[in-house]
């Protein structure tokens, strides 16, 4: 599974998040998050890709304090994702933009090889 390679991270734990259906005054979707001290299975990956809850949260830093990707979480819930993507492209930043479940944005940076987490 290609997603599994792209989002390679910690093999001994992962996060899960379940939306409650509520929102804050600022418009953020409310969720409950937990850490599971287990290996991520192919079934969990597939369910995440299929959009089933709970959402899967890969921990990017592996057991050797290295990572292949990082993510900036933007907690602005009325952000215009198209404007954000154009701004990032205009600045020449190598970031990939996704809408987060809460309505904000996640900006991902990827590396072809493991690098020290402190550099990411």
Name each region found by the language model.
Residues 1-69, 78-86:
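DNA replication initiation on ssDNA origins
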Residues 13, 105-109:
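Broad hydrophobic/π-residue packing in well-ordered secondary structure
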Residues 72:
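Active-site-proximal helix/loop segments of hydrolytic enzymes
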Residues 75:
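Anionic group-transfer/hydrolysis microenvironments
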Residues 80-90, 110-120:
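Helical (often loop-to-helix) elements that flank the catalytic cores of nucleotide-handling enzymes
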Residues 92-98:
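A short linear hydrophobic-aromatic micro-motif
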Residues 98-106:
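Short, conserved phosphate-binding/catalytic loop or strand-edge motifs used
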